[in-house]
Amino acid sequence: MFSSSVSISILVVVAMQFSFIHNVLSLNQTNSYLQHICINSEGKYKAKNSYESRLKDHLDSMSNILDYGFIHGVGGADSSTYYIKAQCRGDASESKCRSCLFTAFSGILRRCPNNRGRIIWYDNCFLYISEIYTYEKIDFKHYLYLHNAKDVSGNKKLFNKNTKALLDKLKEKAIRKEQEPYTRDYMYAAGEESLGTTKLYGMMQCTQDLSVKNCSVCLDSIIAKLPRCCNGKQGGRVLNPSCTFRYELYPFVKP
């Protein structure tokens, strides 16, 4: 289903299990592991040294300053600096957000041991550790594609057009300037669109360190990947360390 280690810039994953996720489980926000990327180009550090100890302590302490679903920090040891960025989904409760990040902290250390650069995604959150300064910057290198194994019935081109239209509408909602910064749903949007007898549900989000302008650029970049990711599929998502979208033919966000 998922590979155990990935170090490529663009990752395509067919998530077969999406076909079997029940609507109720989706609304309960299951904290499913999605995928990770070990960024081997940033090198590795020696195990059990002061760098690793400082990083673990830093991750533990960051869970206590989770005020609005987004955290970032900088630290280092042995003349090396690391940057940490983590964010929860805009509809995740504080308890689910905290639980997801605890899981991400341990998961990323286990799946990418000693990597200086690494990213891990779960359904409710993601975590990014890098020696490259990433704050306020759009990541154009690392993408994760997930899609439902089932194709839509009927006109695929029309469905793709309707999906893009919903995502475009949600993008405008996510970057609205009247939003209050430093709130859990800042630069986050969710909505639905009627497609005859069915409904299409969508969600978009940027990391809260981005400016509204950069959020717009990032969302445009992942919407442009819709044909490559999810052509005619009943559901799909593009994940990136700076922004994300998801759509399904069933409700999956918390109202």
Curated annotation (Swiss-Prot):
Report keywords, A-Z: Repeat, Secreted, Signal
Signal peptide location:
1-26
Q: Name one GO cellular component term.
A: extracellular region
Residue ranges spanning the membrane: these are none
Kindly list the places in or outside the cell where this protein is found, as annotated in its UniProt entry. Secreted
Is the Signal keyword given for this protein? Answer: yes
User: Cross-referenced InterPro entries, in alphabetical order?
Assistant: CRR_secretory_protein, GNK2, GNK2_sf
Which family, according to UniProt?
Answer: Belongs to the cysteine-rich repeat secretory protein family.
Report the protein name in the record.
Answer: Putative cysteine-rich repeat secretory protein 10
* Gene name per UniProt: CRRSP10
